[in-house]
């Protein structure tokens, strides 16, 4: 990844960074909730973004 990124590349990286977080705990407490964890978590070394 070059240090001088295009704006679109930077936007994609920023979005991926925001998505890559655990599930908030208050969501687990909602009634009738079946979501236990964020299934789309990504580790920087295991799975790459292909951008």
From Swiss-Prot:
Organism superkingdom: Eukaryota
Pfam family, one: Ribosomal_L39
GO biological process: translation
Region (Disordered): 1-22
Disulfide bond residue pairs: none
Keyword Signal: no
InterPro entries per the UniProt record, alphabetical: Ribosomal_eL39, Ribosomal_eL39_CS, Ribosomal_eL39_dom_sf
Keyword list, A-Z: Ribonucleoprotein, Ribosomal protein
GO molecular function: structural constituent of ribosome
GO CC annotation, single: cytosolic large ribosomal subunit
PANTHER family tied to this protein: LARGE RIBOSOMAL SUBUNIT PROTEIN EL39, RIBOSOMAL PROTEIN L39E
Subunit organization: Interacts with YIH1.
Family: Belongs to the eukaryotic ribosomal protein eL39 family.
Descriptive protein name: Large ribosomal subunit protein eL39
Source organism of the structure: Debaryomyces hansenii (strain ATCC 36239 / CBS 767 / BCRC 21394 / JCM 1990 / NBRC 0083 / IGC 2968) (Yeast)
